Amino acid sequence: MKLAKNLLVSTLALGLLTGCGSTGNTTTSSDIVTEITEPVEITFWHAMNGAQEESLTKLTDAFMAENANITVTLQNQSSYPDLQQKLTATQASPANLPTLTQAYPDWMLNAVNDGLVLALDEYITNETIGFDDYEDIVEGFRTATVINDKTYAIPFNKSTELLWYNKTLLDGLGLEAPTTLDELATVAQTVQQETGIVGAGFDALSNYYTTYITNEGEVYDADFDVTGQASQDAVNYYLDGVKEGYFRIAGTDKYLSGPFASETVAMFIGSNAGESFVVSGVDGKFEIGVAPFPAKNKIQQGTDLYVFDSATAEQKTAAFEYLKFMTSAESQLTWATDTGYVPVRTSVLESEAYKTNGSLVTPILEEATQGLFTNPVVEGANATYKESATMMEGILADPTIDVASHLEAFKNTLASIW
């Protein structure tokens, strides 16, 4: 069964992944090398560590075994902040950029507008080397790779948010996992009243805020009124719960998987990629339940793979072949099983091999990846996204705060960024 399409979210994503200035270079079909006949080396900057890097290396070795003329040199940049910083610094000297990189879309906006990133549309549709099954890539992931109406990346390591809950506790109270935000508040309130345990919380306040307003039909961009009704509702929904004791924030714990494991919070919204931390923390003390995010629209997170236009024609084709391999169904099954990331292919999400791999989250991810959205990739988007967390934390840390004046100050902050 195909994943359900969310027309509104997809349309917004495609229309809003835009920037100012020029667009990236356009490759025509006649420019594309369709066969690698001589040895070629490509470099790949990434920030994968631990089990992620082990799986990446394993898959890369398998690719090179199948493609004798292509050498892929993996260059670990240590962390996402370090990778972003190096990419930004190196854009001033395009000849020093790698062949391809792992990156978030908002990192690449200026590079795309400066013509430094290869548009992949002609490669994807090429009769000789193109994707035979590009539509199999989850739509919500594909839309995030489009900037200025062109495809500049292939989805790679993806995640979304899920509801983690203490199933033993909820079952004992005769409660079911909530499927809407209203139900989440009701169940959380019941848990708190019956047991004294905090009902729920959200790991990422920026995700909470932007997801809430998206489900209200709004888009978090320069035209959104952060003092308006949707913004007020987002703030007050969480604030009411904090005031009454049935919601909490992660705060100094950073992630709610710790309080969840220690049974001081009954439910929390967090990434599917955090499963190993949840399972190891709980360590069998109670049965863990997991369910899709309790709203129609869910945020998609994670990086995509971009190819730089400074590469030679042969390197571009070699890089594209590598992208195809890394996002093939077989590779995605391996990658998702090894790392806990969401496979980017619908066929893998639907497969029994994936659903029965022993993970708690795999049986529900087909449903959990319906209605995915991405925040608009526009100038200032990353900074304003982070500011939303600062705003939320400031309000939730002081339940006596004047919300209206705080949102007015938030509006002024955003006006200086957009």
Model-derived regions: residue spans:
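Extracytoplasmic/periplasmic substrate-recognition and gating elements
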Residues: E66, T88, S280-Y341
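Extracytoplasmic "Venus flytrap"/periplasmic binding protein-like
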Residues: A62, E66-D136, L173, A266-M267, ...
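Long, aromatic- and glycine/proline-rich binding clefts that accommodate carbohydrate-like moieties
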Residues: T337-T390, G394-I395
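Glycine-centered hinge/linker elements that transmit conformational signals in sensory
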Residues: V187-T190, E194, D223-A250
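Short, well-ordered beta-strand elements
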Residues: T37-N49, I70-Q75, T99-L100, A200, ...
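Short, low-complexity disordered leader/linker segments with a strong preference
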Residues: M1-T43, A65, E408, N412-W418
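Hinge/lid segment of periplasmic solute-binding proteins
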Residues: P105-T160, Q193, T214, E287-A291, ...
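Short, polar/charged alpha-helical segment
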Residues: N49-T71, S388
